[in-house]
Amino acid sequence: MKVTLKDIAKETGYSISTISRVLSNVGKISSKAREEILQAAQRLNYPTSRIAGYEIRKKHLNIALITDFHEGEFYASYYYGMDRAATAEKARLSLLNVPDPSRNINKFLSDLIADKYYDCAIIFATELLRKDYEGLLEVIPDHFPVVSNALIENSVLSTITFDGYSGGHQAARLFYKSGYRRVGIVKGPVIKAESRFRYNGFKDYIDSHPDMDLVWEFQGDFQFNSGVQSFHDMMDSAKEPEAVFLCNDLMATAFVDTAMVNNVSVPDDIAVLGYDDLPMCRHNNPTISSVRTDFQQLGLATIQALKNRFPDNGNQHGILSLIPVSIIERESIRLKIAVA
């Protein structure tokens, strides 16, 4: 005998309209009701082909990775690490580009959820502000887990990202232990939280060591040209730091290349440290020391968090989880003094 929605309603005590919404995977339904209805449908041998997303979830998790994709090694390395993590977790990851996310992401995500192909989403859009995330809460249903990989103060969505404060702190500590006392920094865009965290960690370590001085700062923008400009600004300022922390690898590469063109030796005249440990650091001459961010580790933590939301937990808001970072030392830093 053909199983109908009426049979499931009789089995569970829920209304036919509630059962229809659960089987269609639309609307906001409690996790308890959703699970009871799906279990009843399975017991009664209701055709799984009529349950939205059922077959997909049984085989693998379909994850949408939503980002405002930009040219360059950073995004390529980020996606490569996330894809390797998805493979390890037996999930399927799709890279989806949303241009101008602050204007378009609400409709983009609403349409994506309505298509019923993806089970959950990862958002990596560093341009989004708190008000943008608050707007997203209005379009994300409870049954559709979403995690952000972009840092903001006082997270709105569940957020998993790297510990930028620790990265900045470790950078200053490496300089100190290597014998450098007069140091400088090329910052990232002040509007981006990760830039501020890296700077604050660096500055706090220096402030806690009276014999160490931050003698030069430059406001960069994470782009190659700001690395070039920062070198010329440093030379014009005559501040003469012994070591410089550049808050991403692209600026660090530009700084080192410009130094070499101007007959300034790295590391003999000045030590350099970047951030993210992209492939360019290994391929440069000299090779560049960098704060390593493990994108595969980030991906594993993010996908496991998404999996843990099924079937009972739904979305968790405002939780920030930080992935540890470390430093990879290469030719751009040398030991200036013997350390006891």
Each language-model region and where it sits:
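Alpha-helical recognition/docking segments in bacterial nutrient-uptake
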Residues: K58-R173, D236, A340
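Hinge/beta->alpha junction and helix N-cap segments in small-molecule ligand-binding domains
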Residues: T67-S77, L95-I105, I160-Q170, V186-D207, ...
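Glycine-rich phosphate-binding loop signature in dinucleotide/nucleotide-binding domains
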Residues: L44, D115-Y118, S178, M234-E240, ...
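Periplasmic-binding protein-like
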Residues: A64, Y117-T126, G184-V186, F218, ...
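Short acidic capping loops at alpha-helix termini that bridge into adjacent secondary structure
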Residues: R182, D213-V215, V266-V272
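Flexible loop/turn connectors
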Residues: H232-A340
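N-terminal helix-turn-helix DNA-binding module of bacterial transcription factors
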Residues: M1-K58
